[in-house]
């Protein structure tokens, strides 16, 4: 038994390193605010940056799932880490708006490869009944990287006058993650039978249950990226704080993300998914109310904390349901679900348009609230399916 536990840990630890590297994508919110300030961009122009990241989830998720059928999950994860390193290096070569767009594109491509392949690779290490809690723990590790990014960026900006010192640090960590995983042994089951084509994968969205889960991912990521980018702007608008101080709002969000994931991995092992899903969505509803009416710093922080905790476990709960619904098509299902990360492109663009039109971040909060409303309907569906 000790040998089994050792082998399990030996396979899981490098995967958790990869989850940490996956969290670097959440630096887009912090980076967007600094780039916006430096180049004096409008909300709409600035929000093109996170859109360049999440556009690739829509374009490449299904092709990545097909690539996994050819080269395997582990090699796909390794390829994702290499692309992420390129994204970290580019801004160090030249700091301009076009280069940042290209860097964000590479970050999006790398993260697409990683999200599609890393989650099902976890399924090669753990069995079905532990999948949701293990994926949640992976999200906890990812959230640690998300949490420290804005803190480090603010500290580098104040201490050294250069927030971009974040890039070489994250680049080095990505290299370490790639080397660790590359030298680790993980057994992958062979793909049996005829593999699906691109059209076959897309047709799976014709299943109403699959479509509902896909749209749930769209809403979850839209909320996540939306809060990531808008939280500092809300504080700047209502309290007049400088960006270096307002950026801490993003850290508040990402502090409660790992707390939610850590407690969620335990709770999900003890209770029905729909109950925890419903509680999570309720916290987000309270958060939206707070973000609409909040005028004090502490009140806004509490609202951000609520959505951080509430949104932290939505992804693994939806994703595990999707994988377990079609275990024979886990690669294809993974690709479809990750394609839902297009919400990270759609929501910021709509938020930018709404906030520019209203001249207020109320527009951004309204767009985010649409995603929360959809998750309310999905919570009722979860309840019915688990009766």
Predicted regions and their residues:
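Central cavity-lining transmembrane alpha-helices of secondary-active solute carriers
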Residues: 51-65, 251-263
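Intracellular juxtamembrane helix-capping segments at the cytosolic ends
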Residues: 113-126, 312-326
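Structural signature of the two symmetry-related core transmembrane helices
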Residues: 76-89, 275-289
